[in-house]
Design a protein with these regions (language model features):
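Histidine-acidic metal/acid-base catalytic patches
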Residues: 2, 94-95, 99-100, 106-111, ...
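Short low-complexity, flexible loop/linker segments enriched in glycine and/or proline
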Residues: 48-49, 128-130, 309-310
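N-terminal pre-domain/capping segments
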Residues: 1-100, 319-321
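Generic structural signal for well-ordered alpha-helices
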Residues: 21, 40-45, 98-105, 142-149, ...
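Acidic-and-aromatic substrate-binding clefts and catalytic sites of carbohydrate-active enzymes
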Residues: 10-17, 28-44, 58-63, 92, ...
Length: 321
């Protein structure tokens, strides 16, 4: 699959859905993993092209979930901004947002959906000093997921994605087990994001080292690795950038809008979503054997996206790129 949003920036790459389907098919792809956006073109992608749906997410949501609105007011600058971001001031607002996405996934006949299990504030992004633990995020995420899925007749796989912030990181098998054991939904699984896992090791210098590291962490999971049903395939070797970032703790803007912009820029400096170009990535995919493989790459246009997809596809065939 190819990752996409329904925002104009992505949709305008194609004349229409038929053109998007042709683009994917010519590259040997089965379709798209769609991330719906506020203000997106919700009429552009249909069940003809969508294989999976990536649920929308809140980077910093745990304090909101736990009713600690004062903390969020400090994070976002005002209660009005909190209300604007979450759609209100109580849990039902988060549940409403996710239920809308789940219903859309149902209508699109998506085979899987993706859910982030993570929490990070703007300050934590700059400092890498986090207030919440993996346990706290995982327990709250499991509670939220069960409220969303219990009693529903969804048919898709529900895949929980690792990130490099508190929550599911895929570096602590006991935490992966803690999450899976609490989620009731039978068709649950993991969406392994290779780039996100790479960010857990700031010492990685090459793609080959990264492949070895990912395989090592997967092996540590033993039988739990069978829950890895999906993979977001991409790479970013940005440990040096992060080491520099966390030494500049006073560089974070105090104004919310300026801070939000800076966070956005930093995240994409860290998580670059570049294609693998080492043939060793073939071993990674063949070892894990994901049911769903999404080439989750970042680009600024159709031609650039095609070039990057071709590069990663070639590496997967064992070619040096």
């Amino acid at each position: 699959m190819i990752n996409t949003t329904d925002y104009a920036f992505d949709v305008e790459r194609y004349r229409d859905e038929a053109d998007a389907i042709s683009f994917a098919g010519n590259l040997g792809m089965d379709g798209f993993e769609l991330l719906p956006c506020e203000g997106g073109r919700d009429d552009f992608f249909t069940e003809r092209s969508v294989v999976g749906v990536h649920l929308r997410y809140f980077d910093s949501w745990l304090d909101f979930w736990n009713g600690k609105l004062e903390m969020l007011s400090k994070e976002y600058g005002s209660f009005e901004k909190v209300k604007e971001i979450f759609g209100g001031l109580d849990r039902s607002c988060i549940l409403k947002r996710f239920r809308e996405d789940l219903e859309r996934a149902r209508k699109l006949k998506a085979r899987y959906v993706v859910f982030h299990v993570s929490d990070v504030s703007a300050r934590e992004l700059f400092t890498y000093q986090c207030r919440h633990t993996d346990e706290e995020v995982i327990d709250a995420a499991a509670e939220l997921i069960n409220l969303l899925l219990d009693g529903e007749n969804y048919t898709f796989d529900f895949l929980m994605e690792n990130l490099w912030w508190p929550g599911l990181t895929m570096t602590r098998p006991e935490m992966t087990k803690r999450l899976l054991s609490q989620v009731h939904y039978q068709k649950k699984g993991i969406m392994l994001d290779t780039g996100h896992l790479m960010h857990m090791n700031l010492e990685l210098k090459t793609q080959d080292e990264a492949v070895d590291y990912i395989l090592e962490k997967v092996a540590e999971h033993g039988n739990l690795a069978s829950y890895i049903k999906g993979m977001h395939l991409n790479q970013s070797i940005t440990g040096a950038y992060v080491k520099t970032l966390i030494t500049k703790k006073d560089a974070m803007p105090s104004d919310y809008e300026a801070c939000s912009k800076a966070c956005y820029e930093h995240v994409f400096q860290i998580d670059q979503h570049l294609p693998f170009t080492t043939p060793k990535v073939q071993k990674l995919v063949e070892t894990i054997k994901p049911k769903y493989l999404t080439h989750e790459l970042m680009s600024y246009g159709r031609s650039e996206h095609e070039i990057k997809l071709v590069m990663q596809r070639a590496a997967l065939k064992g070619k040096n790129v």
